């Protein structure tokens, strides 16, 4: 294998050893010396943290109001049931979320295969035990599965959902990554006379929803996309000066005298230190009616004049007043 001394070797996928349906070894070689650790560490981090997948995020169990309780007829307490639900390996096609329902009665184990769902959902580990019923009891459960990435604790979603979340809907820490364990090793490799090359062996275990070869391909794609910015790196030129747009509509910066209100209305506004149209539109009808000597007739006049200019009372203006008005004052 002849080539330029500055030319880098390109690795190839040499072997995929399928140890079990969820456990595989992937070998890539040859790699330049040191690149085994460089690529192995980068791919390991991406495979652990950035692979999209599906996970249980919410659970409703009939008769259960919170996780620190138990359900009559269920051997496990609610917290243990929620932990078992986190082990559910699910894939959802064509949408970002799905709902699984369970209605089981009679003594015996309750497994993932007891859930009912639509055709877009596949439960990869139907034998996974959720809980055990101890007698002739009924267990009714609804589980929400969402698509996501990484690890999202329930506490991070709790504050946003508290006001709308019904009592009894339990939030679950969501680990979306289908990769459960990953390790890599770097061995010596040889190509013709070169013996200083690396061979990268990546060993991974998944929950069965993602093929190991596809996982490597996705991780490499993510890494390449993140490095694109460096490939396209160019000299940073001076940014073009853009014409500054006015922060506010110019009409808001005009004095209220320009509205040509009646003397009574104009005097009432001046008494309240309302100098500019921008000051006026931020007042509400209730606030203006509290102004001495300003009645409903004057209020109607003000509303009509503002409406003719495309304005109204009760408007919100961020960063008002502008610095130019403050300087003038």
Curated annotation (Swiss-Prot):
Catalytic activity reported: RNA(n) + a ribonucleoside 5'-triphosphate = RNA(n+1) + diphosphate
Pfam families xref list: RNA_pol_A_bac, RNA_pol_A_CTD, RNA_pol_L
A biological process from GO: DNA-templated transcription
Keywords assigned by UniProt, alphabetized: DNA-directed RNA polymerase, Nucleotidyltransferase, Transcription, Transferase
Gene Ontology CC, one term: DNA-directed RNA polymerase complex
Coiled-coil annotated spans: none
Stretches the record annotates as Alpha N-terminal domain (alpha-NTD): 1-234
SUPFAM superfamilies in the cross-refs: C-terminal domain of RNA polymerase alpha subunit (SSF47789), Insert subdomain of RNA polymerase alpha subunit (SSF56553), RBP11-like subunits of RNA polymerase (SSF55257)
CDD domains per record: RNAP_alpha_NTD
EC number: 2.7.7.6
Molecular function GO terms recorded: DNA binding; DNA-directed RNA polymerase activity; protein dimerization activity
Family from the record: Belongs to the RNA polymerase alpha chain family.
Domain notes: The N-terminal domain is essential for RNAP assembly and basal transcription, whereas the C-terminal domain is involved in interaction with transcriptional regulators and with upstream promoter elements.
Subunit description: Homodimer. The RNAP catalytic core consists of 2 alpha, 1 beta, 1 beta' and 1 omega subunit. When a sigma factor is associated with the core the holoenzyme is formed, which can initiate transcription.
Protein known as: DNA-directed RNA polymerase subunit alpha
Source species of the chain: Idiomarina loihiensis (strain ATCC BAA-735 / DSM 15497 / L2-TR)
Gene: rpoA
């Amino acid at each position: 294998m002849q080539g330029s001394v500055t030319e880098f070797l390109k690795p190839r996928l040499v072997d995929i050893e399928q140890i079990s349906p969820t456990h595989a070894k992937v070998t890539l070689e040859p790699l330049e010396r040191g690149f085994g650790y460089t690529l192995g560490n980068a791919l390991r981090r991406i495979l652990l943290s950035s692979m999209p997948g599906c996970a249980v995020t919410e659970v409703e169990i009939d008769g259960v109001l919170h996780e620190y309780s138990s359900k009559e007829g269920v051997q496990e307490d609610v917290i243990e049931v929620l932990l078992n639900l986190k082990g559910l390996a699910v894939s959802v096609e064509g949408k970002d979320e799905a709902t699984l329902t369970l209605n089981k009665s009679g003594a015996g184990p309750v497994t993932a295969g007891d859930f009912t769902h639509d055709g877009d959902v596949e439960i990869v580990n139907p034998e996974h035990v959720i809980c055990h019923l101890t007698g002739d009891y009924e267990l009714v459960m609804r589980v929400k599965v969402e698509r996501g990435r990484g690890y999202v604790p329930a506490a991070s979603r709790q504050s946003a959902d508290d006001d709308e979340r019904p009592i009894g809907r339990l939030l679950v820490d969501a680990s979306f990554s289908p990769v459960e364990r990953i390790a890599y090793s770097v061995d010596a490799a040889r190509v013709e006379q070169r013996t200083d090359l690396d061979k990268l062996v990546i060993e991974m275990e998944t929950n069965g929803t993602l093929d190991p070869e596809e996982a490597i391909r996705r991780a490499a794609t993510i890494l390449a996309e993140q490095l694109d910015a460096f490939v396209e790196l160019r000299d940073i030129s001076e940014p073009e000066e853009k014409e500054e747009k006015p922060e506010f509509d110019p009409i808001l910066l005009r004095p209220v005298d320009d509205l040509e209100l009646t003397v009574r209305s104009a005097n009432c506004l001046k008494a309240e230190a309302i100098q500019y149209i921008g000051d006026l539109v931020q007042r509400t009808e209730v606030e203006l009616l509290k102004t001495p000597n300003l009645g409903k007739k004057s209020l109607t006049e003000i509303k009509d004049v503002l409406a003719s200019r495309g304005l109204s009372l009760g408007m919100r203006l961020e960063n008002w007043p502008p610095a130019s008005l403050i300087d003038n004052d």
